[in-house]
Amino acid sequence: MASASTSSSNESESQSVLTWEQVSRLNDVLTEAVPVHGRGNFPTLEVRLKDIVQMVRNRLELRGIMVKDVRLNGSTASHVLVQDIGWSYKDLDVIFRVDLPREEEFQLIKDVVLSTLLDFLPEGVNKEKITPMTLKEAYVQKLVKVYTDQDRWSLISLSNNNGRNVELKFVDSIRRQFEFSVDSFQIILDSVLSYYDLSENPMSQHFHPTVVGESMYGDFVEALGHLTNKTIATKRPEEIRGGGLLKYCNLLVREFKPTDPDEFKALERYMCSRFFIDFPDIVEQQRKLEAYLQSHFIGEERNKYNYLMILRRVVNESTVCLMGHERRQTLNLISLTAFRVLAEQNAIPDVSSVTCYYQPAPYVKDLNFNNYYVASCNQSIPTWLPCN
């Protein structure tokens, strides 16, 4: 009995009922029309999150896959809880909690999601000849399936050219659902979805559903305090994967501060090591970095350079697991990416104001070395030459 009481206590500690202001922001997110952009000649779909979530859920249950609950996850959940923390939410990340005992369920889920997209095609489009494969090629940005002993989940990400992809994740089990306390929030949507089904009245301060938020970090109040005060904290850092380094630097560039700088200095070393374990090849590192910049800095182009400089500093100061040339290779990749970002912003300094200093080769110091060819020159040349 004591153990049941402890479990109940932990659950209540990790959950909290949303205020009306938070429910109102949630309603805005769920009812806003989000464009899903098609490739080639395929039309743009106007999708409201509440509609696609309801339709997918109902059709999954008709096909025998019971949905335990549906949750809003990630930066969008953080936006609902605390509106102004210096960053805008990106992907619309929704989790369907389901049982996935066999791989066959993954195919069924994909079929349901793709067939649902047909209902969002504009009137006048001939749907008869459009196959699921065609819809996948036209509208799916990313398709992921993970089926191991510890992780069973799939992700279907629908394309948005502005970086606000609709991400539908179907989760049976997953080892870790957050990296830091500020991205550990999930908002349970079932009561809101029922409200949309059953009530004809718009939500108001005096008439709205009770909505519960949960922190996977554990203590909801503590995690919300971290989000409000822009502080960085985590638990079980050994579970953080390689992408945690990129997320950590993203928080730093947005002026989040570690709760314990000394502790996080050690954690930086761990995150750098984990990054190079998960992405050992320079080509993989480049692909990962470019994908992260593309998906997390839409509309924030000027922040990219600052982010890259922070990432370079952390890698330079905290990398202990690499050979010297490997470390320099990664630092060079980050520097070149930063330079390209400046070029894209037309922010490269005027070269006329830059002075270049040339270091003589070591053998020039050798007093015995006198094998110089001296060319005659009739005009005087200044000591320092401008780069242009």
Swiss-Prot record:
Keywords: Cytoplasm, Cytoskeleton, Nucleotidyltransferase, Nucleus, RNA-binding, Transferase. Its EC number is 2.7.7.19. GO terms for cellular component: centrosome; cytoplasm; nucleus. It is an enzyme of class 2 (transferase). The keyword Secreted does not apply. It is found in: Nucleus; Cytoplasm; Cytoplasm, Cytoskeleton, Microtubule organizing center, Centrosome. GO terms for molecular function: poly(A) RNA polymerase activity; RNA binding. The keyword Transferase applies. It catalyses: RNA(n) + ATP = RNA(n)-3'-adenine ribonucleotide + diphosphate. One of its GO terms (biological process) is mRNA stabilization. Disulfide bonds: none annotated. Belongs to the TENT family. Catalyzes the transfer of one adenosine molecule from an ATP to an mRNA poly(A) tail bearing a 3'-OH terminal group and enhances mRNA stability and gene expression. This is Terminal nucleotidyltransferase 5C. It comes from Danio rerio (Zebrafish).
